[in-house]
């Protein structure tokens, strides 16, 4: 962009999940460029366009709900007017198929990135208001190629930094600690970690936290702005409030607040999730009010406790006052 676009106060506040009062404060502090036109104030976006955030859903434990969360959070953000790109890095391609995409050529996947250094052209999913870089079994070949090339796990991060036109990029990482998982994890501003409210879920956190620290240390060599905790949000999943065991595990997960925010739990709802998978639609569209409200609540917590905090920490809130 030559000169930043002028955006109304309410629109910028909505984009970042902050109040207009917070926007006014940023203008008064001189951190924003406010422009008055008649009775109304606008903010001029910085050169380079809209604020883009990249987050990776990550855990090496299968069955924690990582892929469905990526699908549903992405759809909810798109419904609110954000421009969203989903990236499927898992050769099992569950995110791809759960959004109704069946036939995928190798050059449409991240195999194209590893071969050429360029992102493939995303698929436009007009029905959901999303863009998707899909996956297929061909993506399994990437693991070996990444092992043979030094620093290749930063390819996706580098390519996404050059990509314009999105407010959010959400990456669905495969349940692994290998090179392909690292490609997805290192691409983001941080990790969104689903934690099943079970003994297995808590035990898996040890490996997740060790990997997160290693990723952070690696990124610190190329980007000094990496946050102290590379985990940006813990999301308790498959929670059954009726069981003593789940409630005890939830208490343990709540104790992680010193490391990163802990979202409200996502309940165990096998029926709605099965219908969403069978119909290849986001969870919000299967007619279960409680499931829809949980995703809406998670989205609010994500915007308030992760996105707004990250933007404030970096001092790049690009919003407006009225």
Curated annotation (Swiss-Prot):
One Gene Ontology molecular-function label: ATP binding
Keyword Isomerase: no
SUPFAM superfamilies, A to Z: P-loop containing nucleoside triphosphate hydrolases
Chain positions recorded as ATP binding sites: 60-67
GO biological process, one term: chromosome segregation
InterPro entries named in the record: AAA_dom, DNA_Partitioning_ATPase, P-loop_NTPase
A Pfam family the protein falls into: AAA_31
Key words, A-Z: ATP-binding, Chromosome partition, Nucleotide-binding, Plasmid
Organism domain of life: Bacteria
Family label: Belongs to the ParA family.
Function text: Probably involved in plasmid DNA partitioning.
Name of the protein in question: Probable plasmid-partitioning protein ParA
Gene designation: parA
